[in-house]
């Protein structure tokens, strides 16, 4: 098929054929990595890693992805270590980055910032998270994880648990899941419910959606996607303290499930996912992190127009 996504800015840009193509290419990349044949695909290419908001997994996995492909990385971490702290605009920063690198990955606390960045330059731009907006590469690796763990998506019951209001990983993954015949269970306190704009975007698709405050709804689900309460997004810290411990996933809850519920988490976790779940075979969140590297290797290659 003809895949034409130089920039990766949000999940709305991907059609079902795009996703089928991406999943297939990630499988190919995974095999190349297993056979030690991926190194050298992006030799001579330079990635600008621009993280203006805290990150461990996403930043390291993108940088590891570029290195594993034979490319190199230049980076900046935090506003205080960039000229933005001196008053430089994101537009000007990106114009400078364009002079140095072949592709840029950006995380920024302002929703919509990746579009500003992409509009400033001709090099590919990948959104690694823009405030409470989206995290498209996380959604793609999450999609790949579910398919790898379950063998399919169609017919699955998928629970999203925790902060559905501010959780950009949830916003992004739900946008991709609308292309599949799934049942979504949204488990959260009313104050952290999924925004109406995302619910409306699901209308007209073959999935179904149910909202509940009952954590035991996870017992009937094939996948439980757990997220932390996003403390940094709350305007009122007292509200965070009131809500942060309402939904907790532990071993006892998962073992009581009617199905072998696969547990996913984009990480980092705080106390919403107990460590006693870690030794269960259906705890897939560390495998999920590993899938992130091959997924991002694939996206880097495709954004740069390098087939494999």
UniProtKB/Swiss-Prot annotation:
Disulfide bonds: none annotated. It catalyses: carbamoyl phosphate + L-aspartate = N-carbamoyl-L-aspartate + phosphate + H(+). Its EC number is 2.1.3.2. GO terms for molecular function: amino acid binding; aspartate carbamoyltransferase activity. InterPro entries: Asp/Orn_carbamoyltranf_P-bd (IPR006132), Asp/Orn_carbamoylTrfase (IPR006130), Asp/Orn_carbamoylTrfase_sf (IPR036901), Asp_carbamoyltransf (IPR002082), Asp_carbamoyltransf_Asp/Orn-bd (IPR006131). One of its GO terms (biological process) is 'de novo' pyrimidine nucleobase biosynthetic process. Gene3D superfamilies: Aspartate/ornithine carbamoyltransferase. L-aspartate binds at residues 86, 168, 228. Pathway: Pyrimidine metabolism; UMP biosynthesis via de novo pathway; (S)-dihydroorotate from bicarbonate: step 2/3. Carbamoyl phosphate binds at residues 57-58, 107, 135, 138, 267-268. Pfam families: OTCace, OTCace_N. It is an enzyme of class 2 (transferase). Keywords: Pyrimidine biosynthesis, Transferase. PANTHER family: ASPARTATE CARBAMOYLTRANSFERASE (PTHR45753:SF6), ORNITHINE CARBAMOYLTRANSFERASE, MITOCHONDRIAL (PTHR45753). Heterododecamer (2C3:3R2) of six catalytic PyrB chains organized as two trimers (C3), and six regulatory PyrI chains organized as three dimers (R2). Catalyzes the condensation of carbamoyl phosphate and aspartate to form carbamoyl aspartate and inorganic phosphate, the committed step in the de novo pyrimidine nucleotide biosynthesis pathway. Belongs to the aspartate/ornithine carbamoyltransferase superfamily. ATCase family. This is Aspartate carbamoyltransferase catalytic subunit. It comes from Leptospira interrogans serogroup Icterohaemorrhagiae serovar copenhageni (strain Fiocruz L1-130). The lineage of its organism: Bacteria, Pseudomonadati, Spirochaetota, Spirochaetia, Leptospirales.
């Amino acid at each position: 098929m003809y895949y034409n996504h130089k920039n990766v800015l949000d999940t709305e840009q991907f059609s079902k054929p795009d996703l089928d193509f991406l999943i297939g290419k990630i499988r190919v990349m995974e095999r190349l990595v297993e056979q030690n044949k991926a190194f050298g695909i992006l030799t001579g290419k330079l990635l600008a890693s621009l993280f203006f908001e805290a990150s461990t997994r996403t930043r390291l996995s993108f940088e590891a992805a570029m290195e594993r492909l034979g490319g190199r990385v230049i980076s900046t971490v935090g506003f205080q270590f960039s000229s933005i702290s001196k008053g430089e605009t994101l537009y000007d920063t990106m114009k400078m980055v364009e002079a140095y690198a072949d592709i840029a990955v950006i995380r920024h606390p302002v929703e919509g910032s990746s579009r500003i960045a992409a509009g400033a330059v001709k090099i590919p731009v990948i959104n690694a998270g823009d405030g409470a907006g989206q995290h498209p590469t996380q959604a793609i690796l999450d999609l790949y994880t579910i398919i790898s763990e379950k063998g399919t998506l169609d017919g699955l019951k998928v629970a999203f648990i925790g902060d559905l209001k501010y959780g950009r990983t949830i916003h992004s993954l739900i946008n991709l899941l609308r292309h599949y015949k799934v049942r979504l269970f949204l488990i959260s306190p009313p104050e952290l419910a999924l925004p109406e704009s995302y619910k409306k975007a699901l209308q007209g698709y073959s999935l179904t959606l149910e909202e509940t405050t009952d954590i035991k709804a996870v017992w009937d689900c094939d996948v439980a996607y757990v997220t932390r309460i996003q403390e940094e997004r709350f305007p009122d810290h007292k509200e965070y303290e009131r809500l942060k411990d309402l939904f907790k996933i532990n071993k006892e809850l998962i073992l009581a499930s009617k199905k072998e519920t696969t547990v996913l988490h984009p990480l980092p976790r705080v106390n919403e996912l107990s460590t006693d779940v870690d030794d269960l075979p259906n705890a897939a969140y560390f495998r999920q992190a590993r899938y992130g590297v091959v997924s991002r290797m694939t996206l880097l290659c495709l954004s740069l127009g390098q087939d494999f």
